[in-house]
Amino acid sequence: KTEEPVCAKSTPSVESSASFRPARALGKNEQLSMEKFRIYLQMKDDKKAFQEIESLVQEYPMDMRYQVILGDVYLQNGKKQEAYDAYQKVLAVEPDNPMALFSMASYYEQTGQKELYQQQLDTLLLNKKVTSDTKISVMRQVIVENEQSSAKDSTQVIALFDRMMKQDIDDPQIPMLYSQYLLSKNMEQEAVPVLEQVVDLDPTNKAARLMLVSAAVKKEDYKQIIKVCEPGIEATPDALELYYYLAIAYHQAEQTDSVLSVCSRALEHVTADTRKEVISDFYSIMGDIYHTKKQMAEAYAAYDSALVYNPSNIGALNNYAYYLSVERRDLDKAEEMSYKTVKAEPNNSTYLDTYAWILFEKGNYAEARIYIDNAMKNDGEKSDVIVEHCGDIYFMTGDVEGALKYWKKALEMGSESKTLKQKIEKKKYIAE
């Protein structure tokens, strides 16, 4: 039989041991004795607690659980030799008894025998006959003890995990706990191969896969994002987050058709519970891609869908408005959409530029200048497009000198505008 510890304290966990699941159903007397034992423990009446357990040991001599609990009660009350004898008695009968192995580790730790403590933990954690659940419980206990100790030496915990990982592991719980521990210590790079082992063992583990995605996003490694997400959407086809990251990564890799297909696949898995903002984002990405492919009707249809699901989708509002203004069509609709973005993010140079440009296309030059100046104040001078727009707007407000200054600056920044050189030569605005 295998018993599984519920470890949550740094002392030899008598209460924990008491809550081990028995291998068989308890009789009424046993249930009563165990309940009394727990109550006596809570009341700190160790003498009566002793008596209850001793009576259970006598009544059920073949049930090793009670022998271990008796040892734990001895240890908690400073009767170290009696505790040792109780554990050894159990291990003589059941050498792989996880309760007794763990209690022996506690015994060695309490008696200051650090090397034996480590050896005992290895005996338990590297034992193929001990269940993964038990090992997980023990490692959680080890982590708690390590965090509570004055030394707080995470290298010991990591070394223990590493020894476990060298075995043939077929349960993803162990590498998952290890990766969570590494992440808690800000060791993200070290956690990556461990998380990869988790998803190899359990491709449906979405949490581990998203941690891998997060690590790749921080490194801006779109190839790694693709590598992690492609099998992810096969294993967990309902995980819309994976489609989203995959779409962004394909976009960076300039795989435009792949972006469209992954967004379409994501939309097939939308349910009544899916957040409307998420659906909107997929349509918005599709709008951006259709625009790069010069499929403007499809782009506008996608943006319309995005705004049906989330009328406040700022990215969709801005891009939709800007592309309309470039085509010089539906300018009132474009202005309305763009104004929402400026209201939502008044210091965003991209949104300020879009709004200024729409006002420019509508002939509202004085107002356009106010917004383009704001865009320039908010990092807009780093964009050759915004700088050129600034020159265009300045020209239309009668400031030819200012216009030339910004047009020349845009040219120096490497602008690919078709009319920019002509504007500088002729000293006047020329529409593209």
Label for each model-derived stretch:
Residues K1-T397, K405-E432:
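Alpha-solenoid helical repeat scaffolds
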Residues E401:
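Residues that scaffold, gate, or flank divalent-cation-dependent active/transport sites
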